[in-house]
C-alpha cells in the first residue's frame, strides 16, 4: 500500500492503492463530500485479494486533496470525471475497471461518455441515471409531492439523515457519534450494522482530513449534468454492471433498474438488505459481484 499526490489541472488529489500493480487496475470513485476513506480499507483489500490493483482517491474539497472555496473556484461533473482520469494518469494506468458509488455513479457515467477509452469495465452502485434530477426530487419529497420522473424519490430515512447532519456537534466524540448515527440511518435494518466499526472508520476519516471535524460540503453546490446527456448512454459499449441496494433510501431499488435500462451493455444486480452504506456485512456479497464482473470483462 502506497500513497501518491497527483495533479489535475490546478488542484492536487491524494490517492493510495492496494494490491499488486501488475494486476488489472480498479479505480474506486466515492460519493459526494466523502474522501477516499469512504471506501473502507477492508473492502478495498478484499477486492485486491481478488486479483485487482485497487486505487482510491480523495475528491477535490475532501480529505487531503486541494480544498478551496467553491464559490471562488466552481467546478462541475466534467471536472470531477477529469479528476478520476488524472488519478489513472498519476498511477500510470491506461485502462481501468471503474466503480462509482452514489455521486460517484454519476461521475462514472460522465467518464463513460467523455473518457470511454480509459475504461475496461464500468460498475455503478447506489446511484441513478443522468436523466434523474435528484435535487428536484428531494425538494418535491420534502413538500410531499410525487417526483416527475415516475420513480420513487428519496425516502424518509434520508431526510432524517439530512436533518441529523445539519445539527451542530460539540467536539470530536460528538461529531463521530453524529456520523455513526447518520450511517446507521442510511444503512437501514436489513443488514447488521456495527456502531464501533463505523466509529473507528470515522475516527480515521477525521485524522485523514487533518483533524477537521466539520464534514465537507462543497459537493452540495454542484449542478447535475444536463438530463439530455442520458441519451448518450445508449452509445456506451464497455461492459457495465449496475448494483442496486434493496433498502437504499436515496436511490431506491427501481433506480438501478432504470439506469441499467439506459445502457445496452448493462446488467443489473441487487444486494439483499443493503442500504446506502458500506458496513462490513455487505463487503462479501458486494465484492463477489464486482469481482465476477471484472473477470468477465477481461
Curated annotation (Swiss-Prot):
Gene3D superfamilies: alpha/beta hydrolase (3.40.50.1820). Pathway: Antibiotic biosynthesis; aclacinomycin biosynthesis. Its EC number is 3.1.1.95. Optimum temperature is 37 degrees Celsius. The activity at 30 and 45 degrees Celsius is 58% and 87% of the optimal activity, respectively. Exceptionally high temperature stability. Optimum pH is 7.5. The keyword Hydrolase applies. Signal peptide: none annotated. Residues 24-277 form the AB hydrolase-1 domain. GO terms for molecular function: aclacinomycin T methylesterase activity; triacylglycerol lipase activity. Disulfide bonds: none annotated. It is an enzyme of class 3 (hydrolase). InterPro entries: AB_hydrolase (IPR050471), AB_hydrolase_1 (IPR000073), AB_hydrolase_fold (IPR029058). It catalyses: aclacinomycin T + H2O = 15-demethylaclacinomycin T + methanol. Keywords: Antibiotic biosynthesis, Hydrolase. GO terms for biological process: antibiotic biosynthetic process; glycerolipid catabolic process. The active site is at residues 102, 248, 276. It holds the Pfam family Abhydrolase_1. Monomer. Belongs to the AB hydrolase superfamily. Hydrolase RdmC family. Involved in the biosynthesis of the anthracycline aclacinomycin which is an aromatic polyketide antibiotic that exhibits high cytotoxicity and is widely applied in the chemotherapy of a variety of cancers. This is Aclacinomycin methylesterase RdmC. The gene is rdmC.
